[in-house]
Amino acid sequence: EGGSIHVDGDGTLMTTEQCLLHPNRNPELDQEEIEQLLREHLNVHNIIWLGEGLMDDETDGHVDNLACFIKPGAVMALISSDPEDENYNVLQDNLLRLKHAKDARERSLEIITVEQPEARWKEDERLAQSYINFYLPNKGIVMPAFNDPVHDNQAREIFEKVFPDREIIQLDAQEIVMGGGGIHCITQQQPKAFVIS
């Protein structure tokens, strides 16, 4: 369940209350106990809690649809500029939490925002589409597209500015999202080797 947490590699972890505090996942643990386990097992010092996930997200609010570290001290976050959108309040709340958050080095976060794509539906459920759900391989970026030329292009331009030294590949992710996930969800990152000298 790699999308339930995101780490910066420098002691800070980000997750959501909806996901890790959900009774389906951790029925016997409260927030303090979960934080203790994350600190012990992942060697993190600071935990940033976002609130809820996207509307109809089958993952119970995985953070990899909402925000991700792009480097220590910097986060990319999904937003909606439409107050009538069902995700607007959730995304505004998460953005506010990020604005007040500090990383493990007590720095305020640099926040790069990306507008969510146009809403799409599968029967009566909204698809949890997010440009934040991308994969970061060596020297590259595999990011989603949603057959929404305006937002797809805007997102790509932001990624090109944020990651100028990486080759960016934008893939149509609509079928992946219909299955209940995104590009980040169907990949598994290989951590950088830690060598003890």
Named regions from a protein language model:
Residues E1-S197:
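The feature marks the mature, well-folded catalytic cores of soluble enzymes
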